[in-house]
Amino acid sequence: VKYDDVMLALFSFKTDKQWQIQLPESPANKPIFVPLTELKQADNVHLAIGHYQDEFELGSVTLDYSKITPINLGNPEHEMLFVAPFVVANQGSGNFWYLGLFRLNNQTADIRHIDSLLLGDRIKLNTIDIIDPLNVSQLKLSYWQHGEQQAMAQTPNQLVEQNIAVSLTGLTQITH
């Protein structure tokens, strides 16, 4: 049996099962799953990367595994719920950042992609924090996005702080 490098390195699971990201914009009746197949490190960023082809479109999914954040919901003896940021890039000009919600089954080494929340195009993510350790159902994200008068080629300069509600079934942006 050839073990999956990503699952072995990130979760110490000796399994041939792959961690697959469901493309957020893929149709519900024909979802596209992209297996994360390679690990890379550059400039203190730790990435798991997968590539896909959908008919004529080529693209990639890149997940920042250094920002995996466990969520203490559900049954920790059998599963771990966690969030992780990932970016979808295709032949267009955008790099669309999402926050993904995942469930790792400790017995079967299956990772299920439960939900995704769009954060923005070409943002620079700072932090993902649990707001209150006693109430793990809320996260606070901090990231830089492009201002209205700013070219996308420039470094984003507008700081955004966003609160996100987490449940066993999904992610919801909290508006003030």
Question: What residues fall within each predicted segment?
Answer:
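Short aromatic loop motif centered on NTY/YTY
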Residues: 108-167, 172-176
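Beta-propeller blade repeat segments, especially FG-GAP/WD-type strand-to-loop junctions
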Residues: 94-114
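Acidic/hydrophobic-patterned starts of short beta strands in beta-sheet-rich repeat architectures
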Residues: 72-87, 135-142
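His-enriched metal-coordination microenvironments in redox/metal-binding proteins
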Residues: 89-96, 120-122
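Beta-propeller blade termini
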Residues: 62-75, 127-134
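Terminal domain-start segments
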Residues: 1-70, 174-176
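Short glycine/acidic-enriched loop and turn motifs that connect beta-strands
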Residues: 88-92, 146-149
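Short, solvent-exposed loop/turn segments at conserved positions within beta-propeller repeat blades
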Residues: 39, 92-96, 152-159
